[in-house]
Amino acid sequence: MKNFFLPCAVVVFLLATGVSKAQSIGDWIDNNCEDCAGRMATQTGAYILEKGEESLVGRAWLTGHATTSIDVQYFIWSTDNVGILAAEGLLSAAERGVRVRVLVDDIMVDAQNETLLLLSAHPNADIRIYNPNIAVGVGFWEKVKNVFSDFRAINQRMHDKTAIFDGVAGITGGRNMADEYFDFNHEYNFRDRDILLVGAAVNEMTANFEEFWDSEYAVPVEVILAEELAQVSDAAVRQRARELHAYAADPRNFAPEVRQAIEATSGQVRPLLESMVWDEMTFISDIPGKNQGDMGLGGGGESTRQLIEALADAKQDVLIQSPYLVMPEGGIEFFEQLIDRGVRIRISTNSLASTDNIQAFSGYASQRKRLLEAGIEVYEYKPYPALRKTLLERYPRIVETNPVFALHAKSLVIDNDVFYIGTFNLDPRSANLNTEVGVLARNEQLALQLAASIEQDIRPENSWRTTQDFNPDDEVSRGKRLKVWLNRMLPIEPVL
C-alpha cells in the first residue's frame, strides 16, 4: 500500500467548503454562464485540463456540488492519498443523498476486500468490478487457471476513465485515481491530460457508462465477495465511515504548501467555465468486451475504427502523443501511406529513461528503426523535463525532491483542426483488447491549443529528437537496457 499521508488536500478543502451551501451543478451553470443552458442541448463546452492540480480541483468541486448522481469509471484506483480522499468524497456525497456508482477494472484494484464491501454498504453507493478474474475475490490457483484457460479474457481490460456528475458535466482523459496522475508524488509523476465537458457529449458519456454498468462484465462486489459480506457488521460499516471522515478532516495529513495552494484555487471554477470552447463534439467508446472476442488477441474496436478514419483524412499534419508506442499490425504501413501523400507525422512518446513500462518500451525499441525509416518524427520524453517547473510551480517542495516525469497523455491533433483527448494508447492493447474512450471533435481553437501543448512537450528541453543515428537509451543503466533486450526476446507484442 502506498503512503497514506502523501500531500493532497484539494479534495477535502473543496468538499468541506462547498457542500453545505452547494447549488446543483445545473443551477450553478445557469447562474454563472449566460448562454450555456441554451447551448448544452446540442453543443458541448470543453476545457482542456493540462495540470494535475486543476484536474483534481475540477473533480472535487463537481463531487461537492452534485445533487443527484455521480458515476465514475476507472482503470486504476489506488489506496494512496488521492484515492482515499476521492473515496471519502464519494461517501460524503452518498450520505447527503447522491446516488454514487463506481465501476473499476479488476486487474489494478489494490483496496482490501473489506474496504470495498464497507464502502458499497451505503444504500446510496454501489461498486462493481469489471471482468473480475484476476484480483478481487480470486484465489491464487484460480488466477493460475484463468491465465491458462482464457488468456484473452485475462488481457481484456476496461481502460475507460470517466467521471460524470448529475448527468450534466463529465471529465475524461488519461488520469487514473492516484497521486502520480495529479503531480502530487514526490518520486514519480505523469505528464497527463484530461478534458472537462458540459453539454451534449456528456449524454453520450452517460450512455456508455450505463452500457458498461448493465453488462455481464460488471459484477457487484457483494456478489464477488458474498462470503466476506456475511462477516461485515453494521458497526464495522459505521466505524470505517468515521475513520474516512476523520482522516479527511485532519490537517496534519496535509503538507503546508498544499494548503496554501488550495486557498488560491477555490475561485477557479467560474473562470474555467467562462474559458470553455463550445462546438459539436463526439464522445467515442468501445462496447463492453471491446469486440466479439472471436479473433483471439485481435479484432479491433469502435474507438480504433473512428481514430483510423480520422487519421485517414489527414491532409498536412498529424501530431500524436502516446506514452506507449507499439504499432499494431499494419500501423507502420498505414502511416507510410499518409507520408507518401505529403502528411507530416510527429509522435511524442516516452524514452527508456522516463517510461514506467519496460515491456511496452521493448516493443517500441523493436520497431523504432522502421518508424524512423518510414519518415515518422519521433520525440522521446526526458525524465527531468524543464516543463515540470511549470507543472509544479505551486509546489516548490515537490520540485525540490526532483521527481521523475513520464508521459501518460493520450492525444491527437490532425491538420490543426481535428483533435482527440482520451485513453487510447498507440499500441495493440488499445487497438484490440482494452476498451477505450475519448473526445473526438473538429474545432480549430482547441486543436491549436492542444498542438501547442504537445509541441511544448517535444521541445529540446523536454524531449530528445530520436533519429536513425541517435537515441537516448544510453541515458539509463546497463541493467535497464538489459531488461529491454530480454523483453524483446519474448512473444508479447500482441498484448503490449
Task: Give names to the regions the model predicted.
Residues M1-F4:
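Positively charged n-region of N-terminal signal peptides that target proteins for export
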Residues P7-A16:
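Bacterial N-terminal signal peptides
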Residues G18-K161, F165-L496:
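Charged, low-complexity intrinsically disordered terminal segments
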